[in-house]
């Protein structure tokens, strides 16, 4: 396994991060336990979850993933072996705390304490803001509509997080689904007012969505706030299993087709087919090629992988052993030029 510093913290995290969002929906607790056991045995010391999980998010499964992880900690007594990341949900989920989903006051206090209780731990290594309080364009949405009173409480949020860092409930903090403008506002306040510094940005990044490179890559490198990429396989498209419009029974697209609209774009299958041809030409597993491409980016701290089977998990973790030649990278970049970011 490979390791990198999380931002400018003292934490060395594996460059493969264990994703968990299927646990409690597509995966049973028993299957999740098997994944955690295996991932740790392979040196994956960085695990990511969220209060909102399992996914697709529903009131009935809210918090289930954290509870499964907490049960594993209780049974195995290996909390100290894991760098644990979770996320507090932003606005738009009315069933969470009666819709009071700001990142300050009682809402944050309740969210944090509830996560700690479900996870059966007294601290979280990386506490992330799942998405901004303000309206932002994501998942390829165009036509930004500015609302004068739509604002993020940057300084108040950092002061609130500082309280829980000082209490020992949080070690470090991070962002998710954030924009360059939002990231820089947080960093400026941290520098100017000696407030907690954001250590990471958890945003989508894959062969089908390299939009992170446009603005956030520079921020990550210059400011030492690395990317934690989610959806490196574009919810399975870059494994090749959805080629020719086929959705295998039990797969994410077959189960929750209406939820994953971000991948149903005109050039998705065309780009996937070209990447598939590259993997076959150079005798590479398509999933491993896709994950390794993400891991090798200078701005990348860790690639979050998810799996519904042990076979998938083993394949994805073994991507750290793969080498991508200059020829492979060149051909990948050529596909990007023909089909630029089909699933932003």
Question: PLM features: residue spans?
Answer:
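Beta/alpha (TIM)-barrel catalytic core signal, keyed to glycine-rich beta->alpha loops juxtaposed to Asp/Glu
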Residues: 132-334
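N-terminal binding-site loop/beta-alpha segment at the start of enzyme catalytic domains
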Residues: 1-86, 122
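Short, acidic/polar
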Residues: 27-39, 104-118, 183-187
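Active-site gating/metal-coordination segments in enzymes
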Residues: 94-128, 204
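N-terminal small/glycine-rich loop or linker at the start of catalytic domains
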Residues: 7-26, 85-99, 128, 132-141
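Alpha-helix N-cap and loop-to-helix initiation/capping positions
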Residues: 27, 31, 60-64, 68, ...
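Short beta-strand segments at enzyme active-site cores
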Residues: 46-50, 83-87, 123-129, 174-177, ...
